[in-house]
């Protein structure tokens, strides 16, 4: 077994209100007054108040924009190369800043033995892992792993890899860092998929420190469980194009997850000899308000059971892979502040496939 010792989060410098983001999207997608009203309704009902971006363009006048310099559909969009230039310039500094917060007071950076980087919004070689190593002056012999292009559930997959490292190297100090710049891939072409992406996705970073089971107080990981709903493989996808990464996100996803989620939870908890009633805290990836509502209905739970997920959605939007770690950080902070002695946490995130990835953990 292994433990999550600490989690830190970070966001890029530009904080945009959902109302400003609606105004920007309305410039791009508005065909007529009726379309504008529909778009405004969707933004208001999103459950999101703020989102962060690596770019200022979404809430400044058009003449001041530097990347998405015009909303005119006839003008060409930034190509994939320009988008990756932004990622390569800003992803590593944000990752390093977040890692340093994560290990502060826990370990010295020279004690880091493993580094796992996670992203589905930017890739290159040398990549984020080597950029972080160089900026932090980490040992060149460090064990590196990159989890790329897996989407919103990738953080759990990375934690699963880190858990395996801890089991084989009990004295390991493992850093997992998830860094996503989803707003880099804004698309001007009007489609349901582009519209949905424009109202949900944001930028963010999260880092965690994992150690072996002999470590001090932390979150002990008990079990991982995953399932794939191939019937939903066309409903959620993430593909590379000349003009950035393209998201497919259908309205059927909440119902697909709802239909199978109770069974998923039962199967996952059965591996640890637990039942749904044993879970004290639910760490659910806030992929969208409807997804959280559908899961609550499937498990016969209330909105109050997912408050940390709703708060992250409200304050940050869906940042893809780091999002569930924002939720988990909130849960861990609340447990510590309330001096809770024991807790059982069930976590779940979803992504292309349609993949459902889960973990079960205890806090003691």
Regions found by a protein language model. Give the residues of each.
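Active-site-adjacent elements of ketosynthase-type condensing enzymes
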Residues: 124-130, 176-196, 225-242, 289-297, ...
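A short glycine/serine-rich beta->alpha loop
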Residues: 81-87, 117, 144-148, 193-196, ...
């Amino acid at each position: 077994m292994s433990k999550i010792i600490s989690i830190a989060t970070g966001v890029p410098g530009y904080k945009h209100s959902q109302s400003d983001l609606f105004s920007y999207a309305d410039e791009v997608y508005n065909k007529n007054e009726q379309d504008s009203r529909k778009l405004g309704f969707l933004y208001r009902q999103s459950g999101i108040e703020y989102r962060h971006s690596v770019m200022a363009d979404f809430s400044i006048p058009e003449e001041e924009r530097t990347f998405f310099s015009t909303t005119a559909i006839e003008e060409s969009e930034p190509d994939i190369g320009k988008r990756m230039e932004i990622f390569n310039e800003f992803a590593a500094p944000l990752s390093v800043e977040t890692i340093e917060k994560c290990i502060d007071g826990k370990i010295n950076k020279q004690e880091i033995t493993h580094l796992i980087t996670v992203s589905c919004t930017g890739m290159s070689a040398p990549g984020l892992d080597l950029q972080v190593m160089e900026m932090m002056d980490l040992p060149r012999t460090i064990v590196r792993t990159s989890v790329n292009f897996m989407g919103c559930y990738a953080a759990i997959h990375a934690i699963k890899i880190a858990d395996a490292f801890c089991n084989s190297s009990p004295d390991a100090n493992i850093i997992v860092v998830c860094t996503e710049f989803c707003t880099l891939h804004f698309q001007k072409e009007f489609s349901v998929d582009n519209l949905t992406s424009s109202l949900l996705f944001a930028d963010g970073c999260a880092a965690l420190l994992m150690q072996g089971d002999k470590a001090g107080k932390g979150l002990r990981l008990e079990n991982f469980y995953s399932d794939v709903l191939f019937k939903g493989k066309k409903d959620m996808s993430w593909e590379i194009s000349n003009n950035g990464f393209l998201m497919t996100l259908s309205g059927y996803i909440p119902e697909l997850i709802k239909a199978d989620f109770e069974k998923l939870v039962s199967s996952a908890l059965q591996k640890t000899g637990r039942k749904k009633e044993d879970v004290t805290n639910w760490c659910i990836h806030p992929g969208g308000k409807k997804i959280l509502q559908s899961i609550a209905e499937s498990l016969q739970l209330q909105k109050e059971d997912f408050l940390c997920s709703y708060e992250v959605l409200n304050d940050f939007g869906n940042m893809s892979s780091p999002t569930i770690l924002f939720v988990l950080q909130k849960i861990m902070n609340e447990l510590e502040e309330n001096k809770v002695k024991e807790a059982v946490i069930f976590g779940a995130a979803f992504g292309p496939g349609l993949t459902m990835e889960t973990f079960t953990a205890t806090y003691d």
